[in-house]
Amino acid sequence: MRFTVGIALCLLLGLGGFVYFFIVDGRVPQSTDFNPSIADIRRLANAPAEERPSAIEVEFLAEDQLPFFGLQAGLDFRSATMARSAFRLKSNWGNTLIDVGMDRYVAALFKTGKKFDDTSLARIGSAMVTARRIVVTHEHPDHLGYLPRSKSLDTLIPKLRLTREQIEATAQYMEDGRIPEAFRGVDPVSSKGFTSVAPGVVLIPAPGHTPGSVLFFVQMADGREVLFVGDIVWTMSNIRDETGRSRLVQSVLMQTSEDRPKTYQVLRWLISFMDQNPDVLVVPSHDDSYLRELVASGRLVQGFGQLQP
């Protein structure tokens, strides 16, 4: 009897350890080696006010429903909405797109975007044609997938500022599995330092979620500052609770495994950055309720084309 009880206890302890390690543990380290100089970034973002962005638009292209523990480590089984979004910075200099989403082919290929808005996709397509600059936060399908499949790709090439990792990833979104020929002549943006990609807009390399992950720091025309963080966090509670994604999500459920140590290093920096810079607006890509709060408060405008060009 004692032997049976002992075996049962060992199994329970083993199961508990497994659940904790793979699902519950999302502790963020207390220190980080990721320390981009915000002073240098601000200097690089400095540009004439009339050329910097004056407004930010957001498209809600698609969405998925999943339990909250898919967004943040833990055992929260509440249903959460994961938005698939794209952003446009409106400027007299010319508009800048941050992420371009995916079409239905890519969404089906990667089994994402269950609720899909074709009208939103059409607006994103038109915005790519009229934009002066196009950038992406990283190379995952819901951020980059539509770009290489655009029928206007040849005319979009001069507008692009992509890293080498982002360019190489375009192959997986094509039926033939090859990088489109139009990309062959593209000179990639450096993944080693900060790059001004448009007046008031600075690219900050932040590998971890993917090798080509970047942040975008924006100085608006009125002096406001915005930080687009892509998928460093999937919900703002990752920052508030200092809790990242679980190992199960990072290693098993994502299309490609996430570099947990690097991602958590960037997350620790982001937590500290927000604490030291509370007036900077942080914009993640997937937190549906938070993004809609920003729309309701007027800090984002929903829908490309809702403002005059």
Positions of the model-derived regions?
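Metallo-beta-lactamase
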Residues: 43-45, 119-126, 130-142, 152-205, ...
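Active-site metal-binding loops of divalent metal-dependent hydrolases
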Residues: 100-103, 139, 209-210, 230-232, ...
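Cap/insert and terminal regions of metallo-dependent hydrolase folds
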Residues: 26, 121-122, 224-225, 229-309
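N-terminal Sec-pathway targeting helices
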Residues: 1-15
